[in-house]
Amino acid sequence: MGVHSDDWIRQMVKKHRMIEPFEESQVRKKVDGSQVISFGLSSYGYDLRVSREFKIFTNVFNSVVDPKAFDPRSFVEMESDCCIIPPNSFALARSVEYFRIPRDVITICLGKSTYARCGIIVNVTPFEPEWEGYATLEISNTTPLPAKVYAEEGLAQVIFIQASEPCSISYAERNGKYMYQKGVTVPRL
């Protein structure tokens, strides 16, 4: 009943493959020595990376963003080492890491301060008990300027919270609609 530490996260990765790929410590530099926005294991969480897959919202077709009838023309898909999000706009992406959440744990995921201090807000819904998949990441540029997000670098921190008791019905048992998601996943009903 509380937030799990780096030791617990490390054990769950070794025993249950909770995070793949897994970085044992905070990575702040590439092999060539250039700096990156940090990712990997931290004291009480795991800093996930954003992949090279992005869906950037666009108004080219004047579509309405409707969660019950999502129009795929609402965004432009791209694969790149970085993503430029237009002013006051939004992009979807996915994590590099694949997660397997234990039955008695729920997560909260918060954007890294490096991006938050630039007006880039990351929203990720909780990873529910026994959810498994790549995380879809919602990235908002709240500034009046274009904003750059770097692929394969840190974007948000996942905090693992122990429940007081296991849930009676897990996300997997409910056949959750985002179970085993692979790519950037748009709204489903």
From Swiss-Prot:
Keywords: Hydrolase, Nucleotide metabolism, Nucleotide-binding. It holds the Pfam family DCD. Pathway: Pyrimidine metabolism; dUMP biosynthesis; dUMP from dCTP (dUTP route): step 1/2. SUPFAM superfamilies: dUTPase-like. It catalyses: dCTP + H2O + H(+) = dUTP + NH4(+). DCTP binds at residues 112-117, 136-138, 157, 171, 181. The keyword Nucleotide-binding applies. GO terms for molecular function: dCTP deaminase activity; nucleotide binding. Its EC number is 3.5.4.13. GO terms for biological process: dUMP biosynthetic process; dUTP biosynthetic process; nucleobase-containing small molecule interconversion. The active site is at residue 138. Gene3D superfamilies: 2.70.40.10. Belongs to the dCTP deaminase family. Homotrimer. Catalyzes the deamination of dCTP to dUTP. PANTHER family: DCTP DEAMINASE. This is dCTP deaminase. It comes from Methylacidiphilum infernorum (isolate V4). The gene is dcd.
